[in-house]
Every structure is written in structure tokens, then in C-alpha cells.
């Protein structure tokens, strides 16, 4: 299993089985038949052990959207051979974005914000007051429906609303608070 061709095939099988959910890649016996049938020294137990070790590292890296340099350091600290480390690093460089997108799509179940636009306008009158001359922000949110159970997958919703100065300040404070929390979690 120290040949790049075979180890890369194992990683490709892992990608198809675990992330792409390929029906042809259901069991490790299939991997043994497809790739390692000519190698008598490679047992199903060895394939399973190596597969699980690779999957553990890739899963950890994918869920934390690990940078390539961090991934390389983790692989270097593991007990993989040099050839296997090179294959894993190459695999992650090539498939990082693809795996992240697959995980992202499978974990989203609500609408997503596709576009936000805004402008400042002057409110001149209302029902109660004939002349106001007060600045307001007009916000427009375009949402994309990502619910896979719905037949209208491409349906987009448009939400428009006005905010006065106080509402805008509150919203900005909340956004800043969210940003601080996200930054604290990413460190």
C-alpha cells in the first residue's frame, strides 16, 4: 500500500463512498476487488485500518475547513509513510474545495442570503405627520430557497424593508456582536 497509485486509489474510493455517495462504492470489499486484487500482501483488515485512518483525518480537516498548511502538519505528525503523506497532501489540495462544498450543501436546510442591497432615502411624510425630512435606509434582501424537499428549488424570495437611524444602529451592533463571536471561534 506504499505505492502512490494504490494509496491514491484508496483516497479516491473514500471520496466517492463517503462524500459523493457513489452507489458503486458501498463496501471495502469492492475496493479490494477493484484495486488490490493483484496484491496478496494487502489484506482487507489492512485496507480497513488505513481507510479509517485516512477518513478520520480527512473528516476532521473537512469539518473545520482546514487550510492546506495545517493539514500537511497534521499528516506529518501521523504515522503515514512519506509516500502516503505526499498522496494525502495532494488529495487534500485537489479535493478540499469539493469536499467542503458537499458538506456545506448537505448541512444547509434553510434559505440562504444570496444578495443584500441598500440605499439611503429621505422620508418626507407619513400618515400622521405631513412633513418629516428624516433619513431612512431601504434594505433589500434576496433569499435563495435551498430546501431540497421542495419542488421549487430555484425559487427566490425578495424582502424589502425600511429602517430608521435607531433601528440601523441596533442592527449594526448585532452584526458587530456576531462578527466578534465568529472571530473568537475561528482563532
Curated annotation (Swiss-Prot):
GO:BP terms for this protein?
Answer: copper ion homeostasis; negative regulation of protein localization to cell surface; negative regulation of sodium ion transmembrane transport; positive regulation of protein ubiquitination; regulation of proteasomal ubiquitin-dependent protein catabolic process
Q: List the disulfide bonds.
A: none
Membrane-spanning residues where? none
List the molecular function annotations (GO) for this entry.
Answer: copper ion binding
Family listed: Belongs to the COMM domain-containing protein 1 family.
The entry describes its oligomerization and partners as:
Component of the commander complex consisting of the CCC subcomplex and the retriever subcomplex.
Q: What is the stated purpose of this protein?
A: Scaffold protein in the commander complex that is essential for endosomal recycling of transmembrane cargos; the commander complex is composed of the CCC subcomplex and the retriever subcomplex.
- What is the protein name stated in its UniProt record? COMM domain-containing protein 1
Organism (species) = Dictyostelium discoideum
